[in-house]
Curated annotation (Swiss-Prot):
Substrate binds at Y65, R68. It is found in: Cytoplasm. GO terms for molecular function: histone deacetylase activity, NAD-dependent; NAD+ binding; protein-malonyllysine demalonylase activity; protein-succinyllysine desuccinylase activity; zinc ion binding. NAD(+) binds at residues 21-40, 99-102, 191-193, 217-219, 235. Keywords: Cytoplasm, Metal-binding, NAD, Transcription, Transcription regulation, Transferase, Zinc. Its cofactor is Zn(2+). Transmembrane segments: none annotated. This is NAD-dependent protein deacylase. The gene is cobB. It is an enzyme of class 2 (transferase). InterPro entries: DHS-like_NAD/FAD-binding_dom, NAD-dep_sirtuin_deacylases, Sirtuin, Sirtuin_cat_small_dom_sf, Sirtuin_class_III, Ssirtuin_cat_dom.
């Protein structure tokens, strides 16, 4: 039974780390990007998620991100988020490394979250170092008087605090994630297609350092051939079931 084996590996491990992708938030109603119903099948990322797109039409890009923010603000963390937060509280999980920008891990109670692709709730100035993080529960960052919004420090445009196609990942987040990958005994890989690098390299780094890899995904991924344990379920139901198995072992 993959669930039983996964639970045993987690309980026996000294250091467990998780890598999450869009599938972890899918059961919260957040659309994924890839797959047959993915956002990139409906929208062209070159028109919405690149520095060139923002330079060409910042209002259009902001309208897209405000639409996504409103979708996320309506969502609630699902068991894929809440179980991970519980595991961290109980000393069973070192950190969450996420490709997601929705902040649902933090809303569920996770404390150590490494955001590889930024945070959709953050506004950043294109010119100076000004940035702010909006609180959706207080209605912040859901609409602006003008698009693009302007920096209160220098007056230049603000942009969403996410990593766009063609941009490097934040170096501090990537270094922390790589260090966690090298030091963990078990890496749970939840809801990621394994197609976006360098995030997709992290499980391979962990494996090369002796870690057990556990994949939770309803579909086969580019990383599946490297996995030691595979749970072919959606993230929310799989994490609920995994937690039940873990509790039996504690």
């Amino acid at each position: 039974m993959p669930l039983r084996e996964a639970a045993e590996r987690v309980v026996e491990a000294e250091t467990v780390v998780v890598l999450t992708g869009a599938g972890a938030s899918a059961d919260s109603g957040i659309p994924t990007f890839r797959g047959k119903d993915g956002l990139w099948n409906k929208y062209d990322p070159r028109e919405l998620a690149t520095p060139e797109a923002f330079a060409r039409d910042p209002e259009k890009v902001w309208e897209w991100y405000l639409w996504r923010r409103r979708k996320i603000a309506e969502a609630e963390p699902n068991p894929a988020h809440t179980v991970l937060a519980r595991m961290e509280r109980d000393g069973l999980l070192e950190a969450v490394i996420t490709q997601n920008v929705d902040g649902l891990h933090q809303r569920a109670g996770s404390r150590r979250v490494i955001e590889l692709h930024g945070n959709i709730w953050r506004d950043e100035c294109v010119s100076c170092e000004y940035q702010r993080v909006n609180d959706p529960e207080r209605g912040e960052g859901l609409e602006y008087d003008e698009l693009p919004p302007r920096c209160p420090e220098c007056g230049d445009p603000l942009r969403p605090g996410v990593v766009w196609f063609g941009e490097p990942l934040p170096s501090d987040a990537l270094v922390e994630a790589e260090n966690l990958a090298r030091s963990c005994d078990v890496m749970l890989v939840i809801g990621t297609s394994g197609e976006v690098r360098p995030a997709a390299d992290l499980p391979l780094v962990a494996k090369s350092c002796g870690a057990t890899l556990i994949e939770i995904n309803p579909s086969e991924t580019a990383l599946s051939p490297h996995m030691d344990v595979i749970i072919r379920e959606r993230a929310a139901s799989a994490m609920e079931a995994l937690w039940n198995e873990i509790e039996r072992l504690l």
